[in-house]
Amino acid sequence: MNPLINFILLSSMIAGTILTTTSHHWVSAWLGLELNTLAIIPIISMTHHPRATEASTKYFLIQAASSALVLLSGIINAHLHGSWDISQLSDNFSKIALTTALATKLGLAPIHFWLPEILQGVPILTALIIATWQKIAPMALLIMIWDLIPTPITLIMGLTSTIVGGLGGLNQTQLRKTMAFSSIAHLGWMITMMTIAPNLTLLNLILYIPMTSLTMLIMHLTMSKTLQNAMLIPSHSLTATSLFLLSLLSLGGLPPLSGFIPKWLILQELTIHNLTPMAFMMAITALLSLMFYLRITYISTMTLPPSTTPLKNTWRFKSHQNTSTLPLLSLISIFLLPITPTLTQ
């Protein structure tokens, strides 16, 4: 793609997210969501492959329908109560319709079916954008109206998403689909805390983005799309192998890595609010997710393909990729647990 067109599309996508996150009016928030969607669709379909075309069509239909539902809920609320302010959503139908629309945009269960198929049909960097940046605007709108959303809806969606994300990732051999189910599971943890402690939802989102970015950037740098490709990661770089291992374990929530922070705090908050059965079920579903993270970790770091080369030194490809973003992402994804008291103040 022409660099100028690429710059315009990325700038429009960033502008749409900023417009939505800073809006207090329903129309401007909807415009930001639409700008975000229209900017990402050419990026999805730029490979001129049938799978990419199919993914862009699916993405457009899902996002257009959910954006229309967002606008409908705003119009109904304005018609009944005379206010376009996001924080003054008082109609019950508008609350449920808006929550459903934003859950569809995020890919929360049970409206998650589009996310794995779309991530599988696009390049890894495009999948990274969809799994991280495209979640910011809908999540920001949910955080703005957190005190207006019915709590049972968020708890049901959260638990369902963690179950679907954990079970769906178990039998996958495609890494992009695995990351899609990982995204669904993490979004389930976020939405569970939406009406109980929105600050924990924001903390979870802030940690989820660098952890997922680090994992998928290493997949891109090592050209790993399947579990079979993951076996070759050690032949690219020992550093990439180590970071891939740690980023996956951090996504799984193992201490003492950064991914343990949100799970620990969320389970603690659920217990404080007398939702111990909910906390127990979410802890069990976290083990399902950890299972497929450990599976990828074992295959990518502890197994090597057959080799007939009688040399002790393992040969590696010479990398020409830009790795300047990896140190910062690694720092955030791995080493934040000691400053947990500072993050929760």
From Swiss-Prot:
- Plastid among keywords: no
An example Pfam family from this entry, by short name, is Proton_antipo_M
| Gene Ontology molecular function terms on file | NADH dehydrogenase (ubiquinone) activity
Q: What is its main location?
A: mitochondrion
From the Swiss-Prot or TrEMBL record, state where the protein is found: Mitochondrion inner membrane
Specify the domain of life of the species encoding this protein: Eukaryota
Q: Which UniProt keywords apply?
A: Electron transport, Membrane, Mitochondrion, Mitochondrion inner membrane, NAD, Respiratory chain, Translocase, Transmembrane, Transmembrane helix, Transport, Ubiquinone
Its transmembrane ranges are: 1-21, 26-46, 60-80, 96-115, 122-144, 148-170, 201-223, 242-262, 274-294, 323-343
Q: Which GO terms describe its cellular component?
A: mitochondrial inner membrane
Q: Does the keyword ATP-binding apply?
A: no
The protein's annotated catalytic reaction(s) are: a ubiquinone + NADH + 5 H(+)(in) = a ubiquinol + NAD(+) + 4 H(+)(out)
Which InterPro entries does this chain map to? Answer: Complex_I_Subunit_2 (IPR050175), NADH_DH_su2_C (IPR010933), NADH_UbQ_OxRdtase_chain2 (IPR003917), ND/Mrp_TM (IPR001750)
* Membrane topology, as annotated: Multi-pass membrane protein
Which principal EC class is assigned to this enzyme? translocase
GO terms for biological process, alphabetical: mitochondrial electron transport, NADH to ubiquinone
What EC numbers are recorded for this enzyme?
Answer: 7.1.1.2
> Which family is this sequence assigned to?
Belongs to the complex I subunit 2 family.
Known role: Core subunit of the mitochondrial membrane respiratory chain NADH dehydrogenase (Complex I) that is believed to belong to the minimal assembly required for catalysis. Complex I functions in the transfer of electrons from NADH to the respiratory chain. The immediate electron acceptor for the enzyme is believed to be ubiquinone.
- Name listed for the protein in its UniProt record: NADH-ubiquinone oxidoreductase chain 2
- State the taxonomy lineage: Eukaryota, Metazoa, Chordata, Craniata, Vertebrata
